[in-house]
Amino acid sequence: MSNQLSLFSEENVPFVNEVEIFNQTFGKINNYEPTIPEKKEWQFVYDFVLEELEEYRQACENGNIVEVLDAICDLTYVATGNGTMLHGLKDKIWPAYQEVQASNMSKTCATETEALETIAKRSKELSVACHFEKVGDRFVVYRSSDRKVMKSINYFKPDLSQFFTTEELAKNYLAETII
């Protein structure tokens, strides 16, 4: 793990900690157990994310890098911070993020042999030409027509259920919300 990533932990999650303090200060919701709150609560976060995403699009179209940074910060604040605290996922977001990162990186191949096997499999199943390129110490397989990354034969989907207890997974979250 890089030095920067080691600064993060289940207790120290930048963006989430700051939003938790903001919510406490302004009387907003901080949940500490997994939950799907009432629709008006999650709809607010959803709409806010869409608003910030639109600001990002406009900033890009206008070529305004300062506004791009502002939009990215706002998106992170709302989606990562508010979303995490609203749904009671503070203790899960960082290990879940690491699992997603590991899954994303499993799209690459560790060896040239693995890359060649991936090309053979993806070319056959998709009927498309593929090639690989060495990037650092990894091999990335691309669909040749558009450079779409092809998943390695050793790709794995992230298992986010591992971050929930049996009781949390068995709970019917819709039963306690107003939809």
PLM-predicted stretches and their roles:
Residues S2-I72, T76-I179:
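Flexible "arm" and connector segments at domain edges
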